[in-house]
Swiss-Prot record:
Organism: Escherichia coli
Listed SUPFAM superfamilies: Phosphoglucomutase, C-terminal domain, Phosphoglucomutase, first 3 domains
Name recorded for this polypeptide: Phosphomannomutase
Keyword Metal-binding: yes
Pathway of action: Nucleotide-sugar biosynthesis; GDP-alpha-D-mannose biosynthesis; alpha-D-mannose 1-phosphate from D-fructose 6-phosphate: step 2/2; Bacterial outer membrane biogenesis; LPS O-antigen biosynthesis
Length: 456
């Protein structure tokens, strides 16, 4: 029995060749089909050069297991989520490696209603079946079919339902950097909707054409070197906002009108405010790493903040429990109740653009006030031999004088004027530190250095 190392905690990712190839993709399709026994599922793929061949091998495996396959073609992950819940099919698989290096590919798997399939919700079972590779003979009489379809119109209809075009009362200039990934065709369709409604929004498109050679680098705007082209275009065109996507556009990253990159933490607050203007009293889910800005905005706007452990499975589950309208992580993952609790990289920028018009404000001024009120360190990673021992040591140092302690995810320790969260990574031998203060950048910086010194 071969061990398939491409199966990770939440998805499938591997180096092309030994770790992931067409034979393995076929086996994954067979395993998904044998385990879940779906009648019909959707598949799609990103722009990577191997995505089409891997997707077709995957589809062959699904069909040999008796599953009918609907292929939506070039797509971002959220288009698979949408197609799965909108069409009412039994599951979906997107072939994507998002922002991984060129020589990688992968898959993201969901079941009915676009519910995620990860380690403890079926991924280990699919892995076991794919590794054993002992599938029953193919029955030609019950072999599935393959059909190409498009859900682009219905998907963009859904996106446009989050905003009211009548609110776009002033001209907006938006730089959109698709990173030669999968986002371009969606932006083109959204642009048509704005134009048809006579809405004065101009799109300046950077690295717009899908190109699996990634001539401008792998699209991962979390890396500072991947931000320059977006920032330059914002400056050159004097744009109101810059928007940059990763390869499968399940995350979007925003730049203000002065071309400054906005940390994901402050975007959560903006989106919470946007939703609470539409639905006062709604519940908003946030993660424990940085919280004060989000809690402040939610309570000021009449909403209810609810904290969840970090990670998409935890946030989606908590959103369902609480019937929360929106959940946000500082890592640029944003989840929406009406999007089957899935994350979307398209909904956030639409809501922020609408908010700019509603508040008749620049993005710089909206965010600068929040950054001044709650300055944050951003996430700092440190490799440690014994992470648990380090966290215990930090806790012993800071707990006695603390105003509040929370262990939802690692440890969060609060004092009246500053707080921090220290947690281990689910995937690497590192600890992750986040520090924030109340309107005191010097204090936040000093405490960050103090804790980092103790971690050595």
């Amino acid at each position: 029995m071969t061990q398939l190392t491409c199966f990770k905690a939440y998805d499938i990712r591997g180096e092309l060749g030994e770790e992931l190839n067409e034979d393995i993709a076929y086996r994954i399709g067979r395993a998904y089909g044998e385990f879940l026994k779906p009648g019909k599922i959707v598949v799609g793929g990103d722009v990577r050069l191997t995505s089409e061949s891997l997707k077709l091998a995957l589809a062959r495996g699904l069909m040999d297991a008796g599953t009918d396959v609907l292929d939506i073609g070039l797509s971002g992950t959220e288009e698979i989520y949408f197609a799965t819940f909108h069409l009412g099919v039994d599951g979906g698989i997107e072939v994507t490696a998002s922002h991984n290096p060129m020589n990688y590919n992968g898959m993201k798997l969901v079941r009915e209603n676009a519910k995620p399939i990860s380690g403890d919700t079926g991924l280990r079972d699919i892995q076991r079946l794919a590794e054993e590779n002992q599938f029953p003979p193919v029955d030609p009489a019950r072999r599935g079919t393959l059909r190409q379809i498009s859900v682009l119109k219905e998907y963009v209809d859904h996106l446009m339902g989050y905003v009211d075009l009548a609110n776009f009362t002033r001209p907006l200039k938006l730089v959109v950097n698709s990173g030669n990934g999968a986002a371009g065709h969606v932006i083109d369709e959204v642009e048509k909707r704005f134009a048809a409604a006579g809405v004065p929004v101009t799109f300046i498109k950077v690295h717009h054409q899908p190109d699996g050679h990634f001539p401008n680098g792998i699209p991962n705007p979390l890396l500072p070197e991947c931000r320059q082209d977006t920032a330059d275009a914002v400056r050159e065109h004097q744009a109101d906002m810059g928007i940059a996507f990763d390869g499968d556009f399940d995350r979007c990253f925003l730049f203000d009108d002065e071309a400054s990159f906005i940390e994901g933490y402050y975007i959560v607050g903006l989106l919470a405010e946007a939703f609470l203007q539409k639905q006062p009293g709604a519940k908003i889910i946030h993660d424990p790493r940085l919280t004060w800005n989000t809690v402040d905005i939610v309570t000021r706007n009449g909403g209810q903040p609810v904290m969840s452990k970090t990670g998409h499975a935890f946030i989606k589950e908590r959103m369902r429990q609480e019937d929360a309208i929106y959940g946000g992580e500082m890592s640029a993952h944003h989840y929406f109740r009406d999007f089957a609790y899935c994350d979307s990289g398209m909904i956030p920028w639409l809501l922020v653009a609408e908010l700019l018009c509603l508040k008749n404000s620049s993005l710089k001024s909206l965010v600068a006030d929040r950054q001044a009120a709650f300055p944050a360190s951003g996430e700092i990673n440190r490799k440690l031999g014994n992470a648990a021992e380090a966290i215990a040591r930090i806790r012993a140092q800071y707990e006695p004088a603390a105003a509040h302690i929370d262990t939802t995810d690692g440890i969060s320790i609060e004092y009246p004027e500053w707080r921090f969260n220290l947690r281990t990574s689910n995937t690497e031998p590192v600890v992750r530190l986040n520090v924030e203060s109340r309107a005191d950048t010097a204090l936040m910086n000093a405490k960050t250095e103090e804790i980092l010194a103790l971690l050595k």
